[in-house]
Design a protein with these regions (language model features):
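Short gly/ser-rich loop at a beta-strand->alpha-helix junction or flexible surface loop bordering the NTP-binding
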Residues: 1-186, 305-347
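Surface segments flanking catalytic/ligand-binding clefts of nucleic-acid enzymes
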Residues: 2-4, 25-30, 165-166, 170-347
Length: 347
């Protein structure tokens, strides 16, 4: 290849064929752009002398993680939300609620701060670093605890733990002793408190918010999360987001997808089925204040306890049912079982 020809980038990793690794300038033009090409419109600078072809999509979250990860020196790794995303955490989008991009945290020393990255020079055992699909990242426990410690609020920290568990990256009973073993780190009190509120079976961040409104704002006993409900003949009726077994009250968060005509019809049919079994429901939608939702939950629970509806439902699972409420249960599934049993979950 001549020095005047832009090299054709190979895919970064067999499992990441859609990604392109940043390249250093190469005077020969074989392994990267020549100095002249790098200054032209066909290459984009990613930082510290690295470049990718200009057609590479910088908004793709995994590409952004890769570009920032290329800045690592010979030690350390990507951590926090970016590591969790790279390890398979589908809910870690790298975008704030206002649509702006979160910086990628790099657990290393001897790296200058710049736009797009947050250097973290905390003590790091080399055993806590792994290479996953060609990129050095901190292991899931470390990455989860990091993001929980630096989360903007306690509720955000709970969401981190729950969504890491959603993707079966961490077991909550391992997260607690891990946090205890790192008591001197910034943000550990918040992380420890968040673990106490966390659950392995939440299916979306907004479900977590509704559960925290239920327990923290309304001050009610903690509901079960995504627990299947059956009639007394063992037929599966539905799996509500939240379920107060004592009161016979369930909670659901309805996002935008629930406004679709067919989806809304299915929701109404299921609500009717729950009602006929003696369950009362509370629905939360986007834009409601915490106090509004909490008041409605309290009122529904009080009404249900007063009415003492007949219990034509149960959470006792029939022998044929395969439980998926815990990370351990989901990890034990075959790929075919995961595709079949977990298809209803979001992300």
């Amino acid at each position: 290849m001549s020095s005047g020809v832009t090299p054709i980038p190979r895919s970064f990793h067999p499992n990441r064929r859609h990604l392109v690794a940043p390249r250093l300038i190469d005077p020969s033009g074989r392994r990267g752009p020549t100095p002249g090409r790098a200054r032209g419109p066909t290459w984009r600078r990613t930082g510290y002398g690295f470049y990718v072809p200009s057609w590479v999509d910088a908004t793709l979250v995994e590409q952004r993680i890769l570009e920032m990860g290329a800045l690592l020196p010979g030690h350390g790794g990507v951590t926090g939300w970016a590591a969790l995303r790279w390890l398979g955490g589908s809910w870690f989008t790298g975008v704030r609620a206002d649509g702006t991009a979160l910086p990628v945290a790099l657990a290393t020393i001897d790296i200058r701060s710049r736009a797009g990255i947050v250097p973290c020079e905390e003590r790091l055992d080399p055993e806590e670093i792994t290479v996953h699909d060609g990129l050095r990242v901190t292991r899931a426990l470390r990455s989860t605890l990091f993001q929980m410690r630096y989360a903007d609020s306690l509720w955000d920290a709970v969401i981190v733990a729950d969504m890491a568990a959603f993707s079966d990256l961490v077991l909550l009973h391992e997260l607690w002793p891990y946090a205890l073993a790192h008591s001197g780190m910034t943000g550990i009190p918040q992380a420890r408190e968040a673990i106490g509120h966390s659950d392995e079976n939440a299916w979306s961040p907004m479900e977590v918010v509704m559960r925290l409104i239920w327990t923290c704002t309304a001050g009610l006993p903690r509901p079960l999360t995504n627990r299947p409900v059956f009639d007394l003949h063992g037929q599966h009726i539905g799996t509500p987001d939240l379920l107060d077994v004592e009161a016979g009250v369930y909670g659901e968060y309805d996002g935008a997808m629930h406004l679709d005509g067919k989806r809304r019809l299915r929701d109404l049919v299921r609500e009717d089925a729950f009602r006929r079994l003696g369950l009362e429901g509370v629905v939360m939608v986007a834009g409601e204040s915490r106090d509004e939702v909490a008041a409605r939950i309290v009122a529904t629970r009080e009404r249900a306890l007063r009415h003492d509806n007949p219990r034509l439902w149960t959470i006792d699972q029939p022998a044929w049912w395969i439980p998926t409420e815990t990370v351990a249960q989901r990890r034990a599934l075959s790929e075919a079982e995961r595709a079949r049993l977990l298809a209803r979950r979001s992300a």
